[in-house]
Amino acid sequence: MAGIVMLMLMAFSTLNGYAQSVKKPDGIVFIENSWMDALHQAQVKNKYIFVDAYASWCGPCKLLKNTTFKNSKVAAFFNDNFINVAIDMEKGDGPALAQQWGIQAYPTLIVFDANGKPVTGTMGYMGAGDLIKFGKLALSKTAAQ
């Protein structure tokens, strides 16, 4: 009997250790460089798409990625309400999308509806509070349509 109890305790402690090792995402969870994947997920989940259009050399883009996008309130809001995609506008499909969307500076942040129609956008670095306001504005515009 004592052996069974010991075995059960070992099993539960192993499971507890596993549960504690599962880590929540650190910031906004982005699909990387795949507009078509984001569009598909948005249609399936009936969510809007938040696009971070960036360039690898862009200082404000790096600041957004390393600070604002990692803010816990920003991450919770965007992960709950949007399909998030980060696209390097100078690689892969990026140049064609930059031309199609009229992007002229980085970072450019754009919200699209689930069908790929632009709702709103902005350029430049934003702090956490301003980015959440931007996201809420986008959701209110889409709700009004």
Predicted feature descriptions by range:
Residues 92-106, 110:
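Structural alpha/beta surface segment adjacent to cysteine/selenocysteine redox centers
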Residues 30-47, 78:
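A short beta-strand-turn-helix
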Residues 1-21:
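Bacterial Sec-dependent N-terminal signal peptides
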Residues 29-33, 53, 64-93:
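Thiol-based oxidoreductase modules, predominantly thioredoxin-like and allied folds used
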Residues 44-59:
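Short active-site neighborhood of thiol/selenol oxidoreductases, capturing the structured segment around
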Residues 58-61, 109:
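The canonical Cys-X-X-Cys-His
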Residues 45-49, 80-83, 113-118, 129:
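Loop/turn elements at helix/coil->beta-strand transitions in domains of secreted/extracellular proteins
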Residues 104-144:
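Non-catalytic, surface beta->alpha helical segment in thiol-disulfide oxidoreductase systems
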